[in-house]
């Protein structure tokens, strides 16, 4: 998902002595890290490119995350794998809240929408 998104910079501050921009990849990494903090999330789900990157031992912290800037706000689409036995509605709600909270707190950007797709269920190891 992350590789599909167009690289964008979000302007968060035009006041003062210069402009502050945040890259879309930074927002995607924040979203991925926040989602992984939720109990019951096993891993992020990605496309085939992300899977190959993982097999090569490279770490892709924005795997399974797509970030889109629309009218001064940020929309996040995120794909996760959950652990068998956990409540999917509860996990997805917590992911939505955690992702929105972390992006807004760390960047000052407004996040009106966090879409979560459960791509798989894995057993706990």
Regions found by a protein language model. Name each.
Residues 38-44, 60-61, 106-110:
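Short secondary-structure junctions
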């Amino acid at each position: 998902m992350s590789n599909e998104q167009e690289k964008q910079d979000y302007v968060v501050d035009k006041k003062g002595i210069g402009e502050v921009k945040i890259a879309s990849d930074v927002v995607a990494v924040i979203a991925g890290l926040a989602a992984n903090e939720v109990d019951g999330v096993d891993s992020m789900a990605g496309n085939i490119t992300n899977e190959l990157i993982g097999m090569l031992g490279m770490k892709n912290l924005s795997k399974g995350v797509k970030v889109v800037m629309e009218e001064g706000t940020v929309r996040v689409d995120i794909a996760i794998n959950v652990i068998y036995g956990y409540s999917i509605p509860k996990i997805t709600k917590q992911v939505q809240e955690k992702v929105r909270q972390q992006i807004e707190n760390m960047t000052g950007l407004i996040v009106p929408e966090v879409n979560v797709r459960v791509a798989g269920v894995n057993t706990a190891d």
